[in-house]
């Protein structure tokens, strides 16, 4: 594999020599950093099983190598990458997989280790959504996830990925993560803090990642990380699990941050060793039981993962000073709720008791029940999924609800051909040889919902959101 020129500050190399265990080769570290990163994907098991996905893409000639710490994760090699980018494939557009770096699958694997089944989870720094969607898949779209993102510009990307993957159990917030310990004390069964960091592990993806690197900036970042971890630990319930991770390699932002928490709260913090997380995990194991993944160990990005348990309750932080404001939604109950449910079921939209109906003017939403106790404590950017807008003739069902809730075996489902699916993704109406019988049509391809549409005469009127419409090649040549 070709090498690329990576910029290494001298002080960084000195720091890495000190941080790297004697069992690892520094020359191999430099060599690994200069190799381009292997592409990897994670199959979205909310939509398709691993076995069914592998059978589906078998004719394409894709070469998939299992990632040892993620059953649904694979390194991928494709001959047609230039002709058809991975993100433009039909399987990606319909949410069957997520393009995710292999090492970034580690934190969620650690969060759910030892058969852990949390019901309310926070992803404190969630964008662009790889780990939130991975958490949702591990939870089977049940319970609730609070996905927070401090960067306003990245919240939109986070929502787009959650929607594409058919996730219904998530609430989005836009806060500095340091507020949650005070705002939501001991409210979560599990928390993932994939902390902002100096990014030393990503040089294989970005050769200039260290252009602005300095030892001083590492210390500044570590100070912020301690405050975020402190907040996360206060938001975690006693007995709950917290995973702290970064994509950097220095000890100040990794081991030292976790040891600071232990020194601060002593017996309230228990480190949970990760040496048995997957075969050969001990090759990256630190004396504390953390995983410090240098890129040459598993041929992936550099990464750090620590898992800990909160053993006892902590004194509350000072109450937050902000005002949340009036909540603009009201629960939908009784006859109204039954009417919406029956109308949705009639077009193939189904949900269970994990989701509750709420209303705001003409909008109908589904909120995860597990998040309702947080209402009034924080301000949400988006909560649950928008199910419909009501109008004189009934309901206008929303695209994100169709992707998350539609049953592809419903009587109104209409399976598109490859050519018809390509037309659908391009925003064009479909003229099938044999039109569907029903006026309300659940459009599917590869037995996955693409949208709800209306049959008008012999055509199916395209309802694919304009902002999602694609041009160019969309399908693998021999699909």
Swiss-Prot record:
Where located? Answer: Cytoplasm
Q: Which Gene3D superfamilies match?
A: 3.10.450.720, Vaccinia Virus protein VP39 (3.40.50.150)
Query: Where do the catalytic residues lie?
Result: 247
**Organism domain of life:** Bacteria
Q: Does the keyword RNA-binding apply?
A: yes
Give the UniProt entry's GO cellular component terms: cytoplasm
Tell me which residues bind S-adenosyl-L-methionine: 125-131, 149, 176, 194
* GO MF entries: RNA binding; rRNA (cytosine-C5-)-methyltransferase activity
InterPro entries linked to this entry: Methyltr_RsmF_N, MeTrfase_RsmB-F_NOP2_cat, MeTrfase_RsmB-F_NOP2_dom, Nol1_Nop2_Fmu_2, Nop2p, RCMT, rRNA_ssu_MeTfrase_F, RsmB/NOL1/NOP2-like_CS
Q: Which reaction does it catalyse?
A: cytidine(1407) in 16S rRNA + S-adenosyl-L-methionine = 5-methylcytidine(1407) in 16S rRNA + S-adenosyl-L-homocysteine + H(+)
Stated EC number for the protein is 2.1.1.178
Q: What biological process terms from GO does the record include? A: rRNA base methylation
EC top class named in words: transferase
Keyword Lipoprotein among record annotations: no
**Keywords from the named record:** Cytoplasm, Methyltransferase, RNA-binding, rRNA processing, S-adenosyl-L-methionine, Transferase
Q: What does this protein do?
A: Specifically methylates the cytosine at position 1407 (m5C1407) of 16S rRNA.
Family indicated by similarity = Belongs to the class I-like SAM-binding methyltransferase superfamily. RsmB/NOP family.
What the entry lists under NCBIfam families is as follows: nop2p, PRK11933.1
Protein name, per record: Ribosomal RNA small subunit methyltransferase F
Q: Which organism is it from?
A: Salmonella newport (strain SL254)
Q: What is the lineage of its organism?
A: Bacteria, Pseudomonadati, Pseudomonadota, Gammaproteobacteria, Enterobacterales
Annotated gene? rsmF
